[in-house]
């Protein structure tokens, strides 16, 4: 087979970024026996439940995991600056990467760096190795990032003017429709050190040989065509559709959930889940409960306890969910609904009884839902999720809106949040779960399921794109 070489993958900390990076790594080594991949792992102090996922892959040929996490003392010292902690945490691992490479005898073919790990381009350059970016979000968000990077750096525009602006809409390359300023990600409009660091990273994307995007041509044709900055490789949907994952549920917990779903009619259950960081205060939980009960639909609800005020932590589990639910709710919805803690999301979305997904619109969750043909009702919380919601509802027609402009502070700043009323939630659920000809969204989601599957098969658009990437990587060593 010729020269053998090693690709170095450096994902950002956190399960969503790690798992999608590892899934693309698996695709690459399955396509070309000349390549092996070392995944360098940086773990945040908070537990993202990734260890069982890594262990499940420990025997995969030509795929190696190396923990390069800095010591607790270094990590704790960095945590004192909340605003720049994440980027500084990644930068603190540069010497660890150098040490790994110095002790490795591999023939290096390139670095594949998470979108937040551009500081590692410096290390790649030191070793005279090509770099690629793995952009874990979608093409529309990449187009927005490049547009705002250009506004800020080339045209000296103070983009904070769009926050609470009288200008309701702006034009952004990658979007067919005018874009509402109220849906702009916070990173696009604030002037913090964190935002500067983020756009410095976007600038550095242009130093690399190409950008892998977790999307596919049939899903985002307009956004992909708008990206002319450099080589773009749409390689998605890259999702973990197996049983292994975050490893938060015991086998018995998952079996109990699946058994309950087995007893429900096809496409009859609305599934509510808001990602690894998603939780709500008691008042909002009660509004959701009222909406579910009034809608009459069967439901499976991942309900998790918010972290303590002022703490950057993952949500926890309730000892008794009755403490936050309307009195008698559990009894009145017995047999119709089931409340769970952490959700085995793939096992649920792949089940035929699930007919709709109320989601925070994290991109991995969106791709999982579309991979199984499940329509979405949008309820974004943070990061670029408001933009994802807008794209799904207005650009692609693959979702209905509960909210698109909802924002929840998850960094412990205790900023006030809106309460979404039960009427608004119920209306969105009814649209999502409507039967037959009334539900154009469901029809489109089923069509996108087929297109997403075809994209990854031999002859498909993402299969071809991944092949071009592998050719480029191999050219680095030939």
Question: Can you annotate each of these PLM segments?
Answer:
Residues 1-478:
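Glycosyltransferase specificity loop/lid
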């Amino acid at each position: 087979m010729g020269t053998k070489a090693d690709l170095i993958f450096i994902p950002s900390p956190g399960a969503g970024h790690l798992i999608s990076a590892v899934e693309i790594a698996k695709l690459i080594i399955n396509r070309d026996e000349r390549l092996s991949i070392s995944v360098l792992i940086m773990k945040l102090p908070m537990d993202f439940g990734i260890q069982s996922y890594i262990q499940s892959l420990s025997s995969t040929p030509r795929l190696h995991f190396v923990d390069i996490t800095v010591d607790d003392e270094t990590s704790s010292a960095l945590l004192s600056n909340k605003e720049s902690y994440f980027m500084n945490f990644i930068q603190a691992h540069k010497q660890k990467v150098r040490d790994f490479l110095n002790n490795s005898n591999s023939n290096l073919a390139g670095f594949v760096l998470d979108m937040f790990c551009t500081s590692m381009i410096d290390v790649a350059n030191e070793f005279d190795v090509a770099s690629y970016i793995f952009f874990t979000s979608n093409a529309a968000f990449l187009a927005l990032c490049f547009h705002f990077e250009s506004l800020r750096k080339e045209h000296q525009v103070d983009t904070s003017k769009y926050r609470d602006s009288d200008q309701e809409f702006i034009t952004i390359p990658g979007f067919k429709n005018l874009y509402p300023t109220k849906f702009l990600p916070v990173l696009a409009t604030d002037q913090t050190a964190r935002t500067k660091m983020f756009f410095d990273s976007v600038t550095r994307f242009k130093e690399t040989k190409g950008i892998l995007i977790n999307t596919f041509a049939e899903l985002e044709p307009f956004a992909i065509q708008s990206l002319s900055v450099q080589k773009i490789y749409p390689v998605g949907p890259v999702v973990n559709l197996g049983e292994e994952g975050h490893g938060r549920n015991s086998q018995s917990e998952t079996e109990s959930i699946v058994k309950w779903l087995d007893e429900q009619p096809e496409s009859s259950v609305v599934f509510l889940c808001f990602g690894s960081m998603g939780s709500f205060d008691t008042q909002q939980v009660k509004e959701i409960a009222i909406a579910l009960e009034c809608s009459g639909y069967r439901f499976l609800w991942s309900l998790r306890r918010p972290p303590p005020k002022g703490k950057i932590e993952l949500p926890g589990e309730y000892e008794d969910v009755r403490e936050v639910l309307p009195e008698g709710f559990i009894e009145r919805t017995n047999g119709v609904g089931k409340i769970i803690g952490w959700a085995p999301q793939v096992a649920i979305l792949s089940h035929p009884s699930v007919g709709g997904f109320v989601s925070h619109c994290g991109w991995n969750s969106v791709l999982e839902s579309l991979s199984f043909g499940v329509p979405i009702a949008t309820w974004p919380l943070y990061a670029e999720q408001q933009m994802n919601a807008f794209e799904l509802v207005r650009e692609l027609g693959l979702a209905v809106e509960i909210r698109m402009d909802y924002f929840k502070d998850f960094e412990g700043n205790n900023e006030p949040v809106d309460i979404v009323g039960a009427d608004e939630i119920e209306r969105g659920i009814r649209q999502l779960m409507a039967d037959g000809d009334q539900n154009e969204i469901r029809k489109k989601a089923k069509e996108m399921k087929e297109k997403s599957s075809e994209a990854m098969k031999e002859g498909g658009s993402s299969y071809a794109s991944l092949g071009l990437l592998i050719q480029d990587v191999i050219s680095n060593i030939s």
